[in-house]
Amino acid sequence: MARESRVKKTFLNMRINMVTYLVAIVISFFTRKIFLDQLGAEFMGLTTTVNGLLGFLNLAELGVAASIAYFLYKPLYEDDRDKINETISIMGYLYRLIGSFILAAGVVFSLFLPLVFKATSFTWSIIYLVFYGQLFCSMLGYFVNYKANTIFAADQRQYLVNGYFQLTQFSSMILQAVLAYYTRSFVLYMVVMVAFAIVNSLILNWKFEKCYPWVEASIQRGKAALKHRPEILLYVKRVFIHQIGRFVNNSAMPVIVYGYASLTMVTLYSNYTLLNNKISNLIYSALGGTEASVGNLIAEGDKQKIFDCYKELYSIKFFVVAFLSLCLVHLNSDFIAVWLGTEYVLPAILVTLICVDFFLNLARNTTDQFINGYGLKADIWVPICRVISLAFIIGAGKLWGLIGILAVPVVVQITLMHIWKPYYLFHSGMQISFGKYWKLLFVNLLPFVIAYLASVIITRQLGFDEGLTTTWRMFLLKAMSFSIPLFLIALFLAWHFCEGIRMFGGRVVNKLS
């Protein structure tokens, strides 16, 4: 029964999240054009940079959410409500402390904003409105939404969080776009963002109370219980180091780009990362609902089932990510040129580095899921190396500019996330030969090497290899001439080479029948 329930919830996550993110992608690209035209590239760069700066403050979250989710897998599986209430109370207590600290630190940090944005054309009232608006939205996660976000995710109901969030996001972005088009008001843009963040919190917590009316989070109980649960703080300390590593890869990059360029360059960079992030979210929404499923499967302890699950998830995610990454490398700039204009196109080498980092960041997802499922957080030197790499990123930025800034994370990702972490999982988690990972990587990579070379030849034969496309019609023709052969050839080869692809295909057929 647990197996059937886990599979059912996984497919439900996939279906619902896929629909919401497809709609989100369409709305995001439509509204992004309006925001750039009406509010300007500099303002959009300001919001992106402020978000990155707040990432520094949010490091204080320490990885508590990920840690608590880990300690909820087993009690949710066993329906141990008392343990669930105790664990979520501990989270409430920790989040009360962390949220208060971040709020105070944010107020102090805001005093230095004139030094950070001294070269901008915005008034200080606009800069402070953007900063405090985004700070307020982040506070909702610490004081209001933490129970719903954590339990829904741990109980494989992440589709509810994503669904309600996307619904309010749709409404917010459409209203922001309408107001931007008619008023060009920075103030109204931020007011709408804050208002809909509040609406999302109200809806999410209403649904949470309906699904889990028995959950009671007590700050006092959490404070007392934490003294008897030292394993939680130990795990939090380990996760925190890993949170720093993620911060280097995500929040720090826009700030570093701003440090070596301008808010406008941040916008050009973020246009590409927006496209990549939307696709990344789409992939996660479709395939990321397996997070809690993996945790529950590992809790059952069947080693053969665990490895079979890893192999299947690795293969299907690799296929999807590799296909989309190669499409992005080949078509990204054409899309930007048609969507926003050629003035927003970055040099090809920068686009390639952005897309390679996109691939590496997503292709590691299966390994990360299983490491989290096993609770393996002892390899603290990995995120420490990521932090040290920040110095290399800054140094490379001084020497080679944006190329250096984007190249260093690629090298770090390959070394740490695609060599060391799989070894760590296979050795300390699944306890099987690391050679099986190299074999799995090879049989998944080979079909795409062959398929990509064949697709490039086909595209060139059709005359789509010269210059950027300038119309949607030409872009669609170029996209189809490349992506269709790539998909069909890769699928044909993967079906013959990859057992994981065949396993997933059989599962889908059985589900449909």
Regions found by a protein language model. Name each.
Residues 26-44, 114-119, 180-183, 247-278, ...:
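Helix-terminus/linker motif at the lipid-water interface of multi-pass membrane proteins
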Residues 2, 430-435, 455-513:
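Membrane-proximal transmembrane or re-entrant/amphipathic helices at the cytosolic face
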Residues 20, 24-28, 50-58, 62-69, ...:
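Short runs within selected transmembrane alpha-helices of multi-pass transporters and secretion channels
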Residues 35-58, 87, 186-191, 227-235, ...:
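Interfacial/gating helices of multi-pass transporter permease domains
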Residues 1-28, 82-90, 125-127, 204, ...:
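N-terminal membrane topogenesis motif
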Residues 33, 62-78, 148-149, 153, ...:
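Helix-loop junctions and terminal segments of transmembrane helices
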Residues 113-134, 328-359, 365, 430, ...:
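Interfacial segments at transmembrane-helix termini and the short loops linking adjacent helices
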Residues 1-10, 187-190, 204-251, 293-308, ...:
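Interhelical loop/hinge segments that connect adjacent transmembrane helices in multipass membrane
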